[in-house]
């Protein structure tokens, strides 16, 4: 049942025109520049405007429509650029030679400093967003279609803006509607994910498939029938996919295999485009739709059948976990920060998984051979995933400070985790120290042996081997699947698993089996180290958000506070907000190593050119396995070898990028200065470590203290 309140809030432009109207203090106007910072910090901090959960919920709900409007405007802009300022049609006719560009540059700049010639008689910057590839996969064959989609995007943006206004000012949902989780799950699963996937599968079958099949066969884009002709004229489809002549009969008579001409289970890549078989992705979206349509009927609403989340959570207790998940239902239905933290953690993890699938199972035509785009998409999804995971910790900490009520949480999992937080943090701290010293130690050993001229004593594939045997086993299991556990598949899910297959498009490697060795084993442990440190900082921020031995009354000071007064030395930068700040810094560290690993590994072992005799020449000549096993190798053969091209680019067609590269490093270094001033954070970490020493009765008589701001200042 949808419960709404009519006309709850007046629409008033006079009110909106007043800066800071949402806060009594800010509405008075500026006295210092702090007013400007607080205006930005609190405009969307709805918790600070009111304590009324219903009103907060409505504001969040309404703001989501605003967010969607911005996304539609942005997307519309992308499509408009494709229509108005791009060489899309030229690229479509020759995707292996023409480089994608949708960003016109003023003649004053000149093409000679921007990638040289992008092809198709076009002046502009080469783009690496993958939009051209996604447009081809969805069946867009002309710039006119891009114009139409761009206009459609603006119409949807207007609709979203209207919905945001309507659902706050005209018909605002009641709190009970926001808290009806079963109904929400049903509708989101069946509606958004189920019907969303189904409609996309429908579009792929009726529009993308026929158009892509003709494009793959070399038919000129201008000769291909328009999308609506494929939808309305069954004879056109029958020429490409004979099963269309039979209509729905095979579906209702359960002879589904009749449809295997457009819904397949092949595995591997299309040798023409280097992308996944579109008939495989059709099958995938259809299957996903079925799963989510079923999932959207699992939760109990008006009819007394199905799951109740409260019951599930309260039944979830093991022999060692006290009250288990009791009380969590109340948390998730009254604290949107807790809900958001959970969702960000899951979506962040998922986004990182997407990053790894984009290169190992490239979903769009000609994506795999566009190396710049592959690198950009991997970097993009890793970063977005990192931001979301850190955001999860941020909102978990805000939940702890603002929404957590210790009196209602007794002996459930959350309470138990908080009560043994010292054990958790000190163990995690130990794990970080162990991982850091050992993984770095392996590299230092190799550098030393290399310097002493003792290659036979190094950890490498040719001396002391540290093979990633579990990873190799997983790879092999998947590589042999097509002839054993997946008898109907023509190839394994990804060429990277192994085997002898190589897909090359236009003389460039799309994908081939990726070998893993000692070098990967070493850098993998650096990944483990950086990820654990990030988790340590973020988790410590959450578990000590309300109190710590250093500041027992942290909950009263709020989520962010500069220092706990002049009388308490070493309490600066110890708020939950500061932990997010430091966690973000380590997230950058972690992702840098991941992107270094990816770039070098792909250039060394995957990307390159293929001769007519099927001989592969990799970009950096397969030097990863022997060079990346020392710190010196990383510095010399990756960082310097790759950066020197940029540093020496001023006289080449890449000079504009060289200048941007220089500027970006200046911005980075300038912001890093401010980051390195953290002090109080360490004192709290020390408290946990002291606790561990006390536990084992090996505590020193002299208490350790972190340096204060003054002591730690570099004079």
UniProtKB/Swiss-Prot annotation:
Annotated phylloquinone binding sites: 682
Residue numbers binding chlorophyll a': 665
Pfam entry (one): PsaA_PsaB
Residues that coordinate or bind [4Fe-4S] cluster: 563, 572
Keywords linked to the UniProt accession: 4Fe-4S, Chlorophyll, Chloroplast, Chromophore, Electron transport, Iron, Iron-sulfur, Magnesium, Membrane, Metal-binding, Oxidoreductase, Photosynthesis, Photosystem I, Plastid, Thylakoid, Transmembrane, Transmembrane helix, Transport
Membrane topology: Multi-pass membrane protein
Transmembrane segments: 60-83, 146-169, 185-209, 281-299, 336-359, 375-401, 423-445, 521-539, 579-600, 654-676, 714-715
Binding site for chlorophyll a: 673, 681
SUPFAM superfamilies: Photosystem I subunits PsaA/PsaB
Chief localisation class: plastid
EC number(s) recorded for this UniProt protein: 1.97.1.12
GO cellular component: chloroplast thylakoid membrane; photosystem I
Catalytic activity from the UniProt record: reduced [plastocyanin] + hnu + oxidized [2Fe-2S]-[ferredoxin] = oxidized [plastocyanin] + reduced [2Fe-2S]-[ferredoxin]
Any GO molecular function: oxidoreductase activity
Entry superkingdom: Eukaryota
Cofactor descriptive note: P700 is a chlorophyll a/chlorophyll a' dimer, A0 is one or more chlorophyll a, A1 is one or both phylloquinones and FX is a shared 4Fe-4S iron-sulfur center.
Cellular localization per UniProt: Plastid, Chloroplast thylakoid membrane
Enzyme class: oxidoreductase
GO terms, biological process: photosynthesis
Similarity remark: Belongs to the PsaA/PsaB family.
Stated role: PsaA and PsaB bind P700, the primary electron donor of photosystem I (PSI), as well as the electron acceptors A0, A1 and FX. PSI is a plastocyanin-ferredoxin oxidoreductase, converting photonic excitation into a charge separation, which transfers an electron from the donor P700 chlorophyll pair to the spectroscopically characterized acceptors A0, A1, FX, FA and FB in turn. Oxidized P700 is reduced on the lumenal side of the thylakoid membrane by plastocyanin.
Subunit field text: The PsaA/B heterodimer binds the P700 chlorophyll special pair and subsequent electron acceptors. PSI consists of a core antenna complex that captures photons, and an electron transfer chain that converts photonic excitation into a charge separation. The eukaryotic PSI reaction center is composed of at least 11 subunits.
Name of this chain's protein: Photosystem I P700 chlorophyll a apoprotein A1
Organism: Phlegmariurus squarrosus
Gene: psaA
